[in-house]
């Protein structure tokens, strides 16, 4: 494989020295970019875009072409590709978000679910990873990703998005055996899927536990974190002569960082409700940290964005082990120039904390 021209993202995850704090942004290839909207219109719909490796590559690279400060690319895909490959029938309702034609409601439903083969059943994702790596030609590392078992399970049991997770939590408490069976099958599927991405060329992977923060502390340990640990234990950790770092991100998980740091991932993602300085004091000896600016700051003017970047950099302090990011994904209404101001500020203001 081509040598990396910029590896500061990987170096920071491994807590090796860097010249400036690396930066990327969740949903950096997305609807806030006019070039993304144009490519999506050409594709016809969101899933057609995800399932076309050439177009998925095109939108993955768009933010890098616009923002030379970006230190990583992230695969353009969706966390719900796994349930779709399990036969749940993913589709998108205008204004409603993702929906499934089939809903999981019993142990029999769960036992009937296959564990997808990444090359046979999700080959379009693996092809996209290979295409992106080829086109990146070593510019920056490529991040692969998956949803966490608990997060995927909520969509499969609810039949789509949910505000209160009533069906998922009812299964968790009424029929924990069924929920554990579903989570175990999803953990196997995620492990296989992420290993497929790593073999195809992903140089780091992130597990998005978007809804882990909806759980009680005890339920989080048993029904979310335990299965992320199972995944991390089964991942390929060395590939193509390099360590493949793993990032765990539980939105709303700031209370549980100590437990998360014991799972074996190189880094933890933080949402904006955490103080990054406190997080570093708690777990910074064991893991790198990624985050954690409130995405809504990007609605403010560039001077305010710069001030918030400066505050977060100062809160983290000197040295490596920090990847700057938002605390969740960028929203569609943000001015692309404000994203550019964010990236510029991170590199300009962070040099003083290194070297």
Curated annotation (Swiss-Prot):
Annotated localization: Cytoplasm
UniProt KW keywords: Cytoplasm, Decarboxylase, Lyase, Porphyrin biosynthesis
Protein name: Uroporphyrinogen decarboxylase
Annotated site, Transition state stabilizer, chain positions: 78
Chief place where the protein resides: cytoplasm
Pfam family, any one: URO-D
Positions annotated to bind substrate: 27-31, 78, 155, 210, 328
Source lineage: Bacteria, Pseudomonadati, Pseudomonadota, Gammaproteobacteria, Pseudomonadales
Gene3D superfamilies: 3.20.20.210
GO CC annotation terms, alphabetical: cytosol
Species of provenance: Pseudomonas paraeruginosa (strain DSM 24068 / PA7) (Pseudomonas aeruginosa (strain PA7))
């Amino acid at each position: 494989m081509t040598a990396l021209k910029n590896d500061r993202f990987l170096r920071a995850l491994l807590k090796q020295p860097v010249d400036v704090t690396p930066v990327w942004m969740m949903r950096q290839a997305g609807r806030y970019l006019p070039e993304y909207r144009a490519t999506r219109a050409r594709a016809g719909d969101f899933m057609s875009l995800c399932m076309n490796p050439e177009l998925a590559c095109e939108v993955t690279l768009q933010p890098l072409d616009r923002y030379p400060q970006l230190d990583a690319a992230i695969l353009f895909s969706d966390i719900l590709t796994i349930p779709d490959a399990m036969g749940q029938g993913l589709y998108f309702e205008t204004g409603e978000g993702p929906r499934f034609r089939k809903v999981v409601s019993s142990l029999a439903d769960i036992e009937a679910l296959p564990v997808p083969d990444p090359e046979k059943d999700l080959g379009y994702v693996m092809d996209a990873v290979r295409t992106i790596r080829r086109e990146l030609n070593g510019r920056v590392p490529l991040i692969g990703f998956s949803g966490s078992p608990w997060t995927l399970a909520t969509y499969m049991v609810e039949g789509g998005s949910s505000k209160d997770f009533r069906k998922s939590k009812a299964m968790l408490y009424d029929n924990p055996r069924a929920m554990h069976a579903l989570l175990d099958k999803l953990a196997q599927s995620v492990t296989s899927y992420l290993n497929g991405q790593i073999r195809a060329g992903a140089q780091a992977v992130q597990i998005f536990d978007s809804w882990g923060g909806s759980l009680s502390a005890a339920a989080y340990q048993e029904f979310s974190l335990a299965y992320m640990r199972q995944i991390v234990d089964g991942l390929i950790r060395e590939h193509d002569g390099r360590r493949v770092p793993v990032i765990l991100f539980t939105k709303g998980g700031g209370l549980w960082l100590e437990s998360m740091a014991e799972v074996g991932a190189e880094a933890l993602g933080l949402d904006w409700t955490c103080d990054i300085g406190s997080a570093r004091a708690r777990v910074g000896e064991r893991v790198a940290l990624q985050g954690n600016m409130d995405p809504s700051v990007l609605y403010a003017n560039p001077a305010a964005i710069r001030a918030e970047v400066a505050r977060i950099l100062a809160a983290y302090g000197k040295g490596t082990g920090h990847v700057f990011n938002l605390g969740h994904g960028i929203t569609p209404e943000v001015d692309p120039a404000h994203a550019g101001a964010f990236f510029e500020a991170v590199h300009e203001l962070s040099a003083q904390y290194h070297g």
